[in-house]
Amino acid sequence: MKNDNRIIKNTIKQFKEKLCRDFSQKANITSITRKLAVFIDTILIQLFIKNKLHFGDNFCLLALGSYGRRELQLHSDIDLLILHTEKVSNIQLQRAQKFIQDCWDVGLEVSHQITTVSSCANLASQDLSVISTIMDMFLLCGHGALMEELIYQTHTLHMWPSHQYFFAKLQEQQSRYAKYGETAYNLEPNIKNGPGGLRDLQILLSISKRHFKIKKLAEGIGYGFITDKEYEELKYCQNFLWRVRFALHMLAGKPEERLSFDYQVKLAQFFGYQDQSHILAIEQFMKDYFKVIKRNRELNEMLLQWFNETIVYHQKQKIIRLDDEFQLSNRFIEVRNNRVFKQNPQSILKLFYWLVKRPDIEGVRASTIRLIRESLFLMGKRFRESKETANIFVNIFRTGNDPYDALQRMNRYGVLAHYLDCFATVTGQMQYDLFHAYTVDQHTLFVIRNISRFKKNEYAKQFPLCAKIITALEKPEILYLGALFHDIAKGRGGDHSELGAIEAQQFTQRHYMEAEDSKLIVWLVRYHLLMSQTAQRKDIYDPKTIEQFCQLLPHAKYLDYLYLLTVADICGTNPTLWNAWKDSLLKELYHAAKTRLHKQQELLDEAALISIRKQYAMDILISDGISSRVIQDLWSQFKGKYFLHESPEVIARHTKAILNSKQFPVVIIMPHHSQGGTEVFIYMPHKDERFTITTSVLSNHHVTIQEAAIITCDNQFDLDTYIILDENNQAFLNEQRARDIQKSLCDHLANTGRLPAVSRRRLSRALTHFNVKTQINFIDDNTNHQTQLFLVTNDRPGLLATISRVFLTLNIHLHNAKIATAGERVEDMFYISNQTGYSLNHEEKTILKEKLILEISKSKY
């Protein structure tokens, strides 16, 4: 018996290998999935007969789900139902269990249920997934009357009537969408369960079967809910996704459903995509994938809406006239006749204007969605150059209401891509990195959604400054249009901000916008990265940084628009990017720039600023009973840049801690509320290796440094401040963890022995698939006798500790550091000097660059 199973197992292996060869040679995927199902039939029937279950009328073997539909993928589960009569003996049931064991022994991944008709029907009446799989039953072997009885008992007359089944499947899809963040355009999409995936096709067939009692979706053409063209589109989407899924199973050697980064690369190679000068093979493949997903989701939406109208509202219509062209039918907008778009193509955009103007409209009727899709050819050059068209499009953003849902529909139905050629080029365009979580078109729409959220009460607590600014914004449509165009030139090569500004300029001219409005939109697109780059890469506590930033703002109002766009952009790029740290940096930059712009004051010199901050801090300390003489004695040892970098409240806190301390090093760990992180403050006798020790200890405690200010005082004491975040990029509040880090820092900083070893940690799975070439650039700051070192490289555990050891080895002194991580990419700025306290010369830069590249390349754990 064991030998028989071994032979069968080998036969299955050989057959699947042949299918893989056929598939690699471009064999038809529908034929392959059917061949696999039929082949598995023969194996199961053979095992069923071997276990003597085919005799008499006691048992029935049924294929369910995709196997029942004859659509078996390479490593899909094989869903089986074994029905038996009430009178079967224990011996016969044991044979059924033995049959299942044999299936497992020959390597078949079988999911099964052994039950009676009545028990199965009872379960189906309570479980949506059971009734759905039963509707795909296929008789393999045994007494067919049992299957017929199950069909009868699970008929809509007895359970799950059409409308109830429809609502349940709709809710199931909504829950599935929510699980995947309402978008199919994720970095690693799920081909089976993600929005626009294969489940979106299966739900259409399931509802059709339940309501119309059809067996195949093609039969729906006769019922009028799908056209020949739409069926061909669905068939194309299905075959594309089947091919990708079969290849994914083949490459993974298991039932993998997620297109992870490593498989994306392999799939692109398998399907023959090749790198081009400005777009990678993987990006081309994923762009095609996302276009199919988009089309699939669009058809899913339209047909589900048709089912809703047919199954739920087939006799209940409440009509409300909107104008001569549109009306509401049960709160869904529709054309008043099928000639509307042909007679006036501008009405295509007018429909979406109504969706924004009337937030109570729940959606678009299926017949009108179909008419939009069939009328896209009307949106030609003449349509796009029409002044009426231009006015309608811009007015979509001028209603004062949220345009996000309407724009999402415009994107799904293909209207945006037909109206804006430049938008068509970024539709489905992914960026192969960990920083950008969505395709460019979906990211753009998420940015617009975020802008709208700033107006809503439920988001006011999360974004209080944004809520305050946007309510006073003179023309919100400018912000929306800036958002629409900010990434419009991605994927072309070159500076997408500059290229996008050209597109924005052409758009504003074609849409007859006022000169001032046009200037602001174009400026927003050109400088949409200015605020985030300034906040994350430069010293925003330096008055010169604020002055340079403000010089790029043509008018004070530009700051409000830029701040809102920056926050919306970061939040719409990746859900993990926004945190209290970035929030605090941008707010501080905003407020500093606002003060500078509105007061129209001359730039205060550093001495004046230091004096002001000292006085405020002094007032705080004196109110706590500390002598001004003691304070001044201590402060006389501090460098001026310390007072520039810290607020009066923080200066007072540090001063108090030092004066109250009886031993060194002084190490304080506490929340830094204004900066959204946790502050590590260190005061101790000078020690060259203290930056290396600190970065190593913090790395071992799995925290990340966001900013570092390193100062050696005139009394040869070190005055260092770090802002750190936990593994989730948040300030940590765990007091025990803070005490552990504090103790570890005190022990190692006081120790004159060896440097602490850095614990070796594996790179995350995602990080291993990206290779950012290490880039190092130097800029001399002659005013401060420092050199700015800008470093770009792959993120990895312990990176900063590695860099600090290079600095220590080469006697490089660090004064300040700004740490920015964007997905797999690290962009760090270090302000350094040589051991004599001056900017690095050419030779020192060369040696440092070579050493950093070498050590970083060795630190890939």
Swiss-Prot record:
Nucleus recorded as keyword = no
Q: Which InterPro entries match?
A: ACT-like_dom_sf (IPR045865), ACT_dom (IPR002912), GlnD_Uridyltrans_N (IPR005105), HD/PDEase_dom (IPR003607), HD_domain (IPR006674), NT_sf (IPR043519), PII_UdlTrfase/GS_AdlTrfase (IPR013546), UTase/UR (IPR010043)
Q: Which cofactor does it need?
A: Mg(2+)
**Region of interest (Uridylyl-removing), residue spans:** 322-678
Residues forming the HD domain are 440-562
Region spans: Uridylyltransferase = 1-321
Q: Which UniProt keywords apply?
A: Hydrolase, Magnesium, Multifunctional enzyme, Nucleotidyltransferase, Repeat, Transferase
The residues covered by the ACT domain are 679-760, 788-861
The entry lists its GO molecular-function terms as: [protein-PII] uridylyltransferase activity; phosphoric diester hydrolase activity
Biological process terms from the Gene Ontology for this record are: regulation of nitrogen utilization
Activity regulation (record text) = Uridylyltransferase (UTase) activity is inhibited by glutamine, while glutamine activates uridylyl-removing (UR) activity.
A Pfam family of this chain: DUF294
Catalysed conversion reaction? [protein-PII]-L-tyrosine + UTP = [protein-PII]-uridylyl-L-tyrosine + diphosphate; [protein-PII]-uridylyl-L-tyrosine + H2O = [protein-PII]-L-tyrosine + UMP + H(+)
Task: Report the EC number(s), separated by commas if there are several.
Answer: 2.7.7.59, 3.1.4.-
Is Transmembrane there in the keyword field?
A: no
Q: Which CDD domains match?
A: ACT_ACR-UUR-like_2, ACT_UUR-like_1, HDc, NT_GlnE_GlnD_like
Family, according to the entry, reads as follows: Belongs to the GlnD family.
| HAMAP family assigned | PII_uridylyl_transf
Q: What is this protein for, i.e. what is its function?
A: Modifies, by uridylylation and deuridylylation, the PII regulatory proteins (GlnB and homologs), in response to the nitrogen status of the cell that GlnD senses through the glutamine level. Under low glutamine levels, catalyzes the conversion of the PII proteins and UTP to PII-UMP and PPi, while under higher glutamine levels, GlnD hydrolyzes PII-UMP to PII and UMP (deuridylylation). Thus, controls uridylylation state and activity of the PII proteins, and plays an important role in the regulation of nitrogen assimilation and metabolism.
User: What PANTHER family does this protein's entry cite?
Assistant: BIFUNCTIONAL URIDYLYLTRANSFERASE/URIDYLYL-REMOVING ENZYME, BIFUNCTIONAL URIDYLYLTRANSFERASE_URIDYLYL-REMOVING ENZYME
In the UniProt entry, what is the domain comment? Has four distinct domains: an N-terminal nucleotidyltransferase (NT) domain responsible for UTase activity, a central HD domain that encodes UR activity, and two C-terminal ACT domains that seem to have a role in glutamine sensing.
The protein's name in its UniProt record: Bifunctional uridylyltransferase/uridylyl-removing enzyme
Query: From which organism does this entry originate?
Result: Legionella pneumophila (strain Lens)
